[in-house]
Structures are given as structure tokens and as C-alpha cells.
Amino acid sequence: MTGTIDFTMMYVTHNAFRRDLDRLAAAAGDPAGTGRIRAGWENFKTQLHLHHSVEDSHLWPRLQRAVTGPDDLVLLEQMEAEHALIDPLLAAVDTAMADPGGTRGPTGPSDPGGPTLAEALRELSTALGLHLEHEEADALPLIQKVLTPADWKAFASEMRRRQGFKGAAVYVPWILDGAPNEERRRFLGALPAPVTLLNRLLWQPRYLRLGFWGAGS
């Protein structure tokens, strides 16, 4: 293998998920504010679904073909299993968000056994946080070891294809929303110049008007 894979996009995306989880946790303590952050929650789900679905279809299979050791194969099985754990946790947040006071359970208002919004978000944050850490600590080094920059480019190209222009118009300013200065610099430096210009002139102002977290952040 020749060349080093640049994981900038992976890290900045993971960190954007973490920031959104922090925003959701902060809002969970105020049931009256749930409607205000619903747009941010829907975007979080959209971004996470895209990220995980392309990993499942185009990254893990490619990695499976490249590895030979049993420990590496177990790691890939763990990655897929961790993805599968996330969907029911997202559904639990949806259910709890419909009744943030906690009186509605997963089967309806007569079922008081469902988690409160704060509890559902805490479970999601724990599971997703552990998965992101696991991926960064073990899967990314394995990818660096056995895949090529061309392999990674193919994965990134599929991500962009599924995202489309409309998706990119939200993804780019979402990544920048609340990112530290150094992370913003690295992310913008990895983008083509026309994309950074589009973001500055069109996408960023439009993103702020969407008010994902109640107001421009």
C-alpha cells in the first residue's frame, strides 16, 4: 500500500454528531423547548443515517475483502452490530420527543414504561459515543493499514453521490456549526475552492435561517 489516508472528513463528521448530542441533551431538560430543536434532531438523523448506510454498504465490505486476521473480522462484525444498535435508540428518542414530559411509552399514552426524553437521549449518546470512539481507536487504524487512498476516495465518492448537491448544502455548514477554529480550518482546507465559496455566499446563510437549534448557533 502506498500513501496515507486523510481522515479529516471522518473526524469532523464524528465531532459534529457529538456536538448535536450535547445540544439535544441540553434541550432535554426543558420539555417546552422540544419543538424548537426538532429540526436539529431531524437533521441529526439524516446525517447519521447517510454516514452509517454508506459505511455499511461501501466501507465495511471493502475492508472485509482486504483483511485476513480473525481479530480484524471480529472488529468489522462489531462495527456492523454497533450500527444496528443505534436505530432502536433513535426510535426511542422519537417516541419520547412526542411526549417530552415522559408520560408516553413506546406503545402509546397508556404505557408509562417508556424512557423520558432525557433518558432516551442519554442512552443514544452513550451508545453512539462509544461506537465513535471504537471506530476511531480501532477501525480507522485498520483502514489506514490495509486500504489505499484510492479505496478511501471510492468510499468518499459514494458518500458524496448519495448526499447530492442538496445534501451538501446542509452538510457543509452543519459541520462548521460550533466547530473549533482549527477544525474549521482543516475542514475548509479539504474542500474545493468553489464549495467554500458556495458555502460562504449561499449555504451558510440558508443554514442559519433554518434555525436547527432554535436560532443561528
What is the role of each PLM region?
Residues 1-217:
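Small-residue-biased structural context
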